[in-house]
Amino acid sequence: GDRRDLNRVDRRQRQMCIRDRYDKVKIVLISGPSSSGKTTFSKRLSIQLMVLGLKPVQISIDNYFVDREHTPRDEKGEYDFESLQAIDIDLFNENLNDLLIGREVRLPRFDFNSGRRSYYNGTFKMKPDQVLIIEGIHGLNPDLTPHIDPARKFGIFVSALTQISIDAQNPISSTDNRLFRRMVRDYRFRGY
């Protein structure tokens, strides 16, 4: 009971913080380690904000990856999707700034199988009653949104701390749990 109550109180406080600052905050940035539950949290937060009368729009920073041939590599020569340089920061900021001033934007979609970015059909224009829910590992990195007024942003850090145990003596660490989640996600949704 106590842990569930604490989660409910925490969730309600987040809702109130965003609602009370809604006139200024138009971007909620969600960050956390790889496979920590950012996308799931974004979906749940969106539903909570809808209950409060807000209209959230979810955007994944992963859709702003540079094309595969421009993706940086780590010391082993493997693609480093967790590097900030793997993101087209200029396009990301251009899109955010355009949305905040009421311009129409063509939002990108990254195809992990082809390693290329494409675009959704049509354009998107942010309405006054909408808030952007943006999730990605660099969501709280100040270098991701250097030209966005901090008063317009609200940041949330998410981490999967739930422990799973094989038995009473053999717990699976949070890091290993995230690795398992990442392997399943990459296989099911990213083609590798």
Question: Where do the protein language model's features map onto the residues?
Answer:
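Single conserved hydrophobic/aromatic residue that forms the stacking wall/gate
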Residues: 2-14, 18
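Short beta-strand-centered segment that lines the nucleotide-binding/catalytic pocket of NTP-utilizing
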Residues: 52-69
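Conserved NTP phosphate-binding and transfer environment spanning the P-loop NTPase/kinase superfamily
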Residues: 21, 142, 146-192
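Hydrophobic anchor at the beta1->P-loop junction of P-loop NTPases
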Residues: 28-30
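Conserved lysine of the Walker
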Residues: 38
